[in-house]
Amino acid sequence: MIGRITGTLIEKSPPVVCVDVNGVGYEIDVPMSTLYALPETGARVTLFTHLVVREDAQLLYGFGSSAERSTFRELIKVTGIGARTALAVLSGLSVAELSQAITLQETGRLTRVPGIGKKTAERLLLEMRGKLGADIGATPHAASGHQSDILNALLALGYSDKESQAALKKLPDGVDVSEGIRLALKALVR
């Protein structure tokens, strides 16, 4: 498998870019977010890649970060989501925004992506739940390490993500971990 490509960017033709590596030009499908982040043609670039070999084609998908590639790989495992739809999702939402949408179960945010209907969005939320948040830490309250620790403790105690997030919202700013867990449990028991 081709995991990463470094070379000279010779062409941008959305959603495909062409990267020259020692005289060989690789056509790589990229999400629009990656395309916009790339420098002008002629510059040296590195893309994290995912290779798909089918009977009739070999397709190379490229991403600006390994987190974006990992998210793509998780997305294509979801029933009804192919590589093109996964690229559309990553074009419309950053990895952090997708993780937040999954954590907060926001079907409306996902249905704004072309190719994602209500049922597909619900399936995506169901199958992706718990697969991104821990890796990326993109929950709305993850800015503080303490809140992340409190959230993980509540989840480990068996509370749902929704309940845990609601309890976190009620905590005062700057609370330490042990006090935060105590206050969150108190809020959850009510």
Swiss-Prot record:
GO biological-process terms attached to the record: DNA recombination; DNA repair
Localization per record: Cytoplasm
Signal peptide: none
Keywords: Cytoplasm, DNA damage, DNA recombination, DNA repair, DNA-binding
GO molecular-function term, one example from the UniProt record: four-way junction helicase activity
Coiled-coil intervals, chain numbering: none
Highest taxon listed in the record's lineage: Bacteria
Region (Flexible linker) location: 137-141
DNA-binding among keywords: yes
SUPFAM superfamilies attached to this UniProt entry: DNA helicase RuvA subunit, C-terminal domain, Nucleic acid-binding proteins, RuvA domain 2-like
Ranges for region Domain II: 65-137
GO cellular component, one term: Holliday junction resolvase complex
Ranges for region Domain III: 142-190
Residue ranges of the region described as Domain I: 1-64
Gene3D superfamilies: 5' to 3' exonuclease, C-terminal subdomain (1.10.150.20), DNA helicase RuvA subunit, C-terminal domain (1.10.8.10), Nucleic acid-binding proteins (2.40.50.140)
InterPro entries the record matches: DNA_helicase_Holl-junc_RuvA_I (IPR013849), Hlx-hairpin-Hlx_DNA-bd_motif (IPR003583), NA-bd_OB-fold (IPR012340), RuvA (IPR000085), RuvA_2-like (IPR010994), RuvA_C (IPR011114), RuvA_C_sf (IPR036267)
Comment block on domains: Has three domains with a flexible linker between the domains II and III and assumes an 'L' shape. Domain III is highly mobile and contacts RuvB.
Chain's role: The RuvA-RuvB-RuvC complex processes Holliday junction (HJ) DNA during genetic recombination and DNA repair, while the RuvA-RuvB complex plays an important role in the rescue of blocked DNA replication forks via replication fork reversal (RFR). RuvA specifically binds to HJ cruciform DNA, conferring on it an open structure. The RuvB hexamer acts as an ATP-dependent pump, pulling dsDNA into and through the RuvAB complex. HJ branch migration allows RuvC to scan DNA until it finds its consensus sequence, where it cleaves and resolves the cruciform DNA.
Subunit structure: Homotetramer. Forms an RuvA(8)-RuvB(12)-Holliday junction (HJ) complex. HJ DNA is sandwiched between 2 RuvA tetramers; dsDNA enters through RuvA and exits via RuvB. An RuvB hexamer assembles on each DNA strand where it exits the tetramer. Each RuvB hexamer is contacted by two RuvA subunits (via domain III) on 2 adjacent RuvB subunits; this complex drives branch migration. In the full resolvosome a probable DNA-RuvA(4)-RuvB(12)-RuvC(2) complex forms which resolves the HJ.
Family membership: Belongs to the RuvA family.
Protein name: Holliday junction branch migration complex subunit RuvA
Organism: Bordetella pertussis (strain Tohama I / ATCC BAA-589 / NCTC 13251)
